[in-house]
């Protein structure tokens, strides 16, 4: 059994088409088909369900695919380990992040690249479900996501920060000068919020429900930038995570208002697949994360914006204030 055969199988499972898989592997289709048939013979199991076209993998093939992905991932890890011994970390770190955590990723990737000048980073914006799948299939080295997500499976977790929520509203809004706003009061404003399929929105919906109301925003977006693009016309309000202030800040004509609610929000952090040894690049990012002080950096920035909005007595405390 050759590693090349496993690479062909992984490509076929990804492309779901013999010709496209062959093209992705830079070989002819007959060569790819022959290599996979030889793999079936060597393992003495049917791997591919064949008809007039590719019809998927057999149950045995699915198991072989999992092992192939694992073996190829371990091969990459070995190469990275050896590259470090030869003269420093290099290669490409494959990093995924939920959309609501994207604004803070630079707090990790910038010091990572400054420390490891021969390494590169590819960054994908992914749903928590996609992150789980890509980690399991060894298509990601590490990801930034909610740590309490039940779908994560077997992963190692490194907390980065707790989400804290606040209202962004026009300075002429009826809530702009309040010391605290309730979720019920927020629900009465002209709102733009994240889309319901976003985990962040589902968390917020829970807070609205706990306050006895349902939010019905006029505008919904699946990106943070989509929300912020509506906040310059002095009409719309939204609820944001304090982590977004790092990239977007407080738009002109807007004001931050603390929200009454739980003192502790959901945790966001780094996750990697629970395997040993850890991928070298992922381990290097974890080392950076432990020294980056993301939690403190975000809280310090939050204090600045709260003080600018006149909340000096709330700065340095949790954004959401309990009853």
Residue ranges, per PLM feature:
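Flexible hinge/capping segments at coil-to-helix
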Residues: 154-191, 282
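Secondary-structure junction motif
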Residues: 104, 146, 176, 181-182, ...
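N-terminal winged-helix
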Residues: 29-30, 34, 80, 86-116, ...
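C-terminal effector-binding regulatory domain of bacterial HTH transcription factors
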Residues: 242-253, 261-323
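Hydrophobic hinge/microswitch elements
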Residues: 127-140, 146, 197-257, 305-307, ...
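A short LG(V/I)-centered, amphipathic sequence patch enriched
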Residues: 40-62
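Short beta-strand-centered segments that line the small-molecule binding cleft or hinge
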Residues: 70, 85, 107-113, 122, ...
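N-terminal short secondary-structure element
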Residues: 1-35, 51, 55, 64-65
């Amino acid at each position: 059994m050759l590693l090349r055969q496993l690479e062909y199988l992984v490509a076929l499972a990804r492309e779901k088409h013999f010709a496209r898989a062959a093209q992705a592997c830079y070989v002819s289709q007959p060569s790819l088909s022959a290599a996979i048939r030889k793999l079936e013979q060597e393992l003495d199991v049917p791997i591919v369900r064949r008809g007039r076209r590719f019809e998927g993998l057999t149950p045995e093939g699915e198991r072989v695919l999992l092992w192939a992905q694992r073996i190829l991932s371990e091969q990459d890890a070995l190469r990275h380990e050896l590259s470090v011994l030869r003269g420093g970390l290099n290669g490409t770190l494959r990093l995924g992040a939920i959309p609501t955590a994207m604004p803070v990723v630079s707090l990790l990737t910038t010091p990572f690249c400054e420390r490891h000048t021969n390494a590169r980073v590819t960054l994908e914006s992914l749903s928590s479900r996609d992150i789980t799948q890509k980690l399991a299939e060894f298509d990601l080295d590490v990801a930034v996501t909610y740590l309490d997500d039940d779908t994560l499976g077997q992963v190692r977790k490194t907390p980065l920060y707790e989400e804290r929520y606040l209202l962004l509203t026009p300075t002429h809004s009826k809530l702009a000068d309040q010391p605290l706003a309730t979720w019920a009061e927020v629900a009465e404003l002209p709102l733009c919020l994240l889309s319901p399929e976003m985990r962040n929105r589902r968390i917020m919906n829970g807070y609205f429900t706990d306050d006895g109301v349902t939010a019905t925003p006029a505008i919904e977006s699946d990106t943070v930038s989509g929300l912020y693009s509506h906040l310059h016309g002095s009409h719309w309000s939204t609820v944001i995570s304090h982590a977004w202030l790092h990239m977007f800040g407080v738009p002109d004509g807007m004001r931050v208002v603390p929200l009454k609610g739980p003192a502790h929000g959901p945790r966001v952090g780094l996750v990697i697949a629970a395997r040993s040894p850890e991928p070298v690049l992922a381990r290097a990012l974890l080392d950076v994360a432990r020294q980056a002080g993301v939690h403190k950096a975000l809280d310090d920035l939050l204090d600045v914006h709260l003080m600018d909005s006149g909340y000096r007595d709330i700065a340095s405390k949790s954004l959401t204030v309990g009853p």
